[in-house]
């Protein structure tokens, strides 16, 4: 049966740790593996980091730049080199590829989100392997994915993939960073988000010298992907052939089981495609109504409003301790909501001077996170 497979490979797997130069043998094996999967009738997407790391090596820089303008310039240098290597390797295997550069704003606007989906659909139908990266050269901080783990999970969610492989510099998830804690406990299978939270995994968030994605970003990416029904695996990037073995049933790496009832595409867009512009702190009654009964959010349940937003913007819903429980599209601006929070819906027209929605966020526009 044909599968849709998204593979993300990080800078730490693509480059030599000492020099930042491309690890050509790893990339060649990756190209062979992905081409083989395509020949078996699967649809394959590669999300590749490495543009900044390769650019650093090309320009003789000894560490990843911190200044945004310099980093964007270095990414422009590295992206061309990276794609040339991919194109040369895949061409020898008679496998066409396509470069797809995305920014967060491509997923924020619903129309552009659907356009991206349609582009992927056409490329996959043509038998092409899209090679995806964040468009670091033009991305701004407010609208960045931040790391390609998140980007790969959003792409996997968008195309409703069957598998997401996060290739990294460790062989699986551990209870602590095995590079600094030798007796860290390996974790082979995570069956639910609750189990993931209960593990309280003490992982490093620093990432490698040349990359941006630590283990915490991979856990966050897994959360996004399994909500979309995508089975997610964290495994060693130096051994791309393990992808074939895992698909055939071997339990290599850490597996995250997908949710049995995936969230709808529109709600996934609300939860993960949009960038929240505000926060609503809720009382315990509102939290119970949303989480346990699937109700809409009413103004009476809102205790505090933070941030500035307009109607139909995305906001985070938080408990009194600041833990996120949901996201949604709000029916009122922050200015109006500050006036009606804590009040009954029947008082809205009197307070605001116009007849608005009874709900702050309707349940159709609300998704638990």
Curated annotation (Swiss-Prot):
Pfam families: AA_kinase, PUA. Its main location: cytoplasm. Pathway: Amino-acid biosynthesis; L-proline biosynthesis; L-glutamate 5-semialdehyde from L-glutamate: step 1/2. GO terms for molecular function: ATP binding; glutamate 5-kinase activity; RNA binding. ATP binds at residues 8, 168-169, 212-218. One of its GO terms (cellular component) is cytosol. CDD domains: AAK_G5K_ProB (cd04242), PUA_G5K (cd21157). Coiled coil: none annotated. Its EC number is 2.7.2.11. InterPro entries: AceGlu_kinase-like_sf, Asp/Glu/Uridylate_kinase, G5K_ProB, Glu/AcGlu_kinase, Glu_5kinase, Glu_5kinase/COase_Synthase, Glutamate_5-kinase_CS, PUA. Substrate binds at residues 49, 136, 148. Catalyzes the transfer of a phosphate group to glutamate to form L-glutamate 5-phosphate. HAMAP family: ProB. This is Glutamate 5-kinase. The lineage of its organism: Bacteria, Bacillati, Cyanobacteriota, Cyanophyceae, Nostocales. The gene is proB.
């Amino acid at each position: 049966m044909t599968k849709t497979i998204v593979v993300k490979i990080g800078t730490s797997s693509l480059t030599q740790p000492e020099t930042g130069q491309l690890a050509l043998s790893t990339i060649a094996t990756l190209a062979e593996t992905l081409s083989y999967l395509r020949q078996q009738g699967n649809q394959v997407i590669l999300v590749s980091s490495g543009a900044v790391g390769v650019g650093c090596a090309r320009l003789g820089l000894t560490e990843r730049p911190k200044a945004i303008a310099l980093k964007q310039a270095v990414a422009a240098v590295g992206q061309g080199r990276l794609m040339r290597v991919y194109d040369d390797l895949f061409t020898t295997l008679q496998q066409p590829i396509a470069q797809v550069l995305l920014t967060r704003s491509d997923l924020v606007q619903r129309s552009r989100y659907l356009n991206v989906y349609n582009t992927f659909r056409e490329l996959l139908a043509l038998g092409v392997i899209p090679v995806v990266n964040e468009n670091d050269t033009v991305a701004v901080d407010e609208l960045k994915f931040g790391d390609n783990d998140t980007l790969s999970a959003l792409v996997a969610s968008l195309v409703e993939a069957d598998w997401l492989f996060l290739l990294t510099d460790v062989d699986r998830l551990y209870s602590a960073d095995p590079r600094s804690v030798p007796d860290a406990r390996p974790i082979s299978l995570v069956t639910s988000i609750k189990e993931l939270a209960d593990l309280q995994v003490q992982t490093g968030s620093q990432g490698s010298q040349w990359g941006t994605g630590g283990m915490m970003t991979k856990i966050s990416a897994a959360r996004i992907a399994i909500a979309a029904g995508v089975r997610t695996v964290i495994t060693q990037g130096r051994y791309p052939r393990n992808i074939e073995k895992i698909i055939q049933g071997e339990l290599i790496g850490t597996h995250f089981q997908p949710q049995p009832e995936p969230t709808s595409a529109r709600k996934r867009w609300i939860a993960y495609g949009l960038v929240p512009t505000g926060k609503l702190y809720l009382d315990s009654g509102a939290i119970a109504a949303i989480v346990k009964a699937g109700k809409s959010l009413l103004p009476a349940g809102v205790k505090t409003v933070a941030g500035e937003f307009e109607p139909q913007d995305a906001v985070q819903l938080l408990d009194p301790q600041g833990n996120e429980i949901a996201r949604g599209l709000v029916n009122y601006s922050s200015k109006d909501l500050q006036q009606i929070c804590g009040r009954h819906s029947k008082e809205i027209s009197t307070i605001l001077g116009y007849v608005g929605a009874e709900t702050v966020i309707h349940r159709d526009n609300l998704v638990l996170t």
